[in-house]
């Protein structure tokens, strides 16, 4: 068994496996920006693009594409996630996917080494039957992807943050708050908005949203009906919202953040690290994170047409544990060109009818099994896992056949083939059987892994 590791961010542990040979692509860091790129075998005009090698990380790619070339490439928000690995190969949602789609949708060309040691240059013109599987079929599954070429996009003019919280003073007012927010949701289910709304057992909603190509004044006008409703119920809610807007060109510019919003980032001060390396402070909690429970689900757009019913579902689920609703990790409401590109990938088609994605997780940091003083409390872990299971069972029961994002899913998902890939799975399995019949590449809940015993 051969396992591929890029940066090792996989939530399902697909970048490692027992009794296997591990290939680590960390030092393959070449990045090349193209003004006009024509995929191999193509006879059409070129498009702006970037080629990234297997060990490239998104911060390095954004530096080349945005800071130095004035373009945007659809990638991940966490700066240390790999740009040529499981993120793209597993579809790849980011904060701006309602505008730009998934990372896989931007793939123009892939260089892949198959199990029989054959080097293939895959595009929509050459080996087109590999095009879909590499665009969303999962990392470390069909071969070793040594480099990818991704379409780049015109840079948005502005980037904004919409951050705050609303606390309801009773269960009744919290249920009504959820309903009112879901009533309002269509106003932000579009290509301008992304990121999260968090619901908690403490009757609190946290808003951590981003927006693009809107001014602060436009955002204020969009949300004013919701603010007016809150103001009409001063005895029921305490709330505070901050709106900020910055030039999009500075999204990945460490000097801009250090000068203007230093509390939002963490500069990498370790000796010998590349200049300009940083991560978002909100990602601190992911360092050495030990998961007790991790479950997720797409929420069909049709459910948003009945806000009262969906509010009851969300309220009941929030009694067990907090969860986040991601605006940008679903494609109903996304820009048409982004949707058109993603329909050519092998992502579960149910995503096109989903208006949001929900994640419920319970975890701790600084937990290390086998190290005295840092061992997990098993009883505590099981109690939190049970809370996550109980809360997500309510959401799953309300969303049969909704499907899920394969990169961020329950490790124990029982019907993973259908949940992750829907009716695309037979095609994926056929490609797997053709290029890797002996299952040289096999990871947890990857295409064909059910045949590995």
Regions found by a protein language model. Name each.
Residues 1-453:
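Soluble FAD-dependent oxygen oxidases
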């Amino acid at each position: 068994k051969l396992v591929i590791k890029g940066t090792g961010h996989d939530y399902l542990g697909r970048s490692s496996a027992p009794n296997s040979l591990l290939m680590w692509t960390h030092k393959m860091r070449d990045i090349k920006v193209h003004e006009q790129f024509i995929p191999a075998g193509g006879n059409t005009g070129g498009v702006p693009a970037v080629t990234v090698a297997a060990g490239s990380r998104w911060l390095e790619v954004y530096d080349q594409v945005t800071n130095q070339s004035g373009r945007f490439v659809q990638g991940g928000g966490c700066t240390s996630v790999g740009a040529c690995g499981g993120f793209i190969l597993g579809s790849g949602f980011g904060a701006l996917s309602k505008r730009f789609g998934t990372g896989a949708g931007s793939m123009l060309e892939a260089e892949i080494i198959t199990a029989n040691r054959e080097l293939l240059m895959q595009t929509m013109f050459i080996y087109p039957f590999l095009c879909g599987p590499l665009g969303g079929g999962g990392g470390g599954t069909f071969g070793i992807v040594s480099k990818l070429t991704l379409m780049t996009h015109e840079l948005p003019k502005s980037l904004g943050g919409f951050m705050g919280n609303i606390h309801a003073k009773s269960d009744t007012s919290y249920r009504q708050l959820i309903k009112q927010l879901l009533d309002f949701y269509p106003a932000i289910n579009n290509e301008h908005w992304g990121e999260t709304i968090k619901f908690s057992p403490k009757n609190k909603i946290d808003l951590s949203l981003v927006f693009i190509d809107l001014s602060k004044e436009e955002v204020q006008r969009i949300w004013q009906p919701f603010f007016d409703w809150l103001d009409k119920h001063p005895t029921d809610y305490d709330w505070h919202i901050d709106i900020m807007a910055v030039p999009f060109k500075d999204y990945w510019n460490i000097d801009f953040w250090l000068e203007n919003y230093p509390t939002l980032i963490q500069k990498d001060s370790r000796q010998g690290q590349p200049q300009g390396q940083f991560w978002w402070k909100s990602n601190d909690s992911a360092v050495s994170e030990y998961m007790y429970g991790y479950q997720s689900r797409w929420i069909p757009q049709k459910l948003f047409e009945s806000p009262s019913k969906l509010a009851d579902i969300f309220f009941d689920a929030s009694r067990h544990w907090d969860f986040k609703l991601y605006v940008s990790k679903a494609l109903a409401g996304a820009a048409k060109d982004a949707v058109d590109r993603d329909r050519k990938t092998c992502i579960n088609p149910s995503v096109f009818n989903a208006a949001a994605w929900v994640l419920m997780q319970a975890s701790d940091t600084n937990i290390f099994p086998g190290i005295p003083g840092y061992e997990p409390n098993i009883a505590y872990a099981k109690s939190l896992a049970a809370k996550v299971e109980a809360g997500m069972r309510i959401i799953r029961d309300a969303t049969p056949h909704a499907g899920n994002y394969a990169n961020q899913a329950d490790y124990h998902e029982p019907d993973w083939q259908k949940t992750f890939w829907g009716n695309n799975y037979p095609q994926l399995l056929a490609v797997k059987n053709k290029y890797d019949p002996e299952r040289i590449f096999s990871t947890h809940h990857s295409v064909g892994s059910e045949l590995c015993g």
